[in-house]
Amino acid sequence: WFDENHPRYRAAACRALDRIFASWQESRGAARAGSAPIFEINTGAISRGWRTTPYPAPWILQEIRARGGQIMINSDSHAVDTLTCAFPDAVKLALDCGFTRVKIITEQGFEDYSLI
């Protein structure tokens, strides 16, 4: 196990985010101006009894938001009965981190969905 608040972990996570966003900009360029990578808030470990809170940690979500990232909520479920496990907790986490919208997948592709 590791401490996700340890300064070395935080620095590594922020460097990874910087690389993700730089790569996104390089690969998308002007063709996708205004778009941003989508990250997930995941509740799968809750349904499996491994965690009690969604992940990633709030500070990581705040770093994603500060860089202009978008989010979606996912349960990583393979069973109908856990498909929306802890989604209210994930929505609260998103709102607490400053997100007001999430991405959802529709037949037309990714669309915005308001959390408020």
List each model region and its residues.
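A short acidic, helix-capping loop that chelates divalent metal ions and anchors anionic groups
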Residues: W1
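Charged catalytic cores and adjacent phosphate/nucleic-acid-binding surfaces used
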Residues: E4-I116
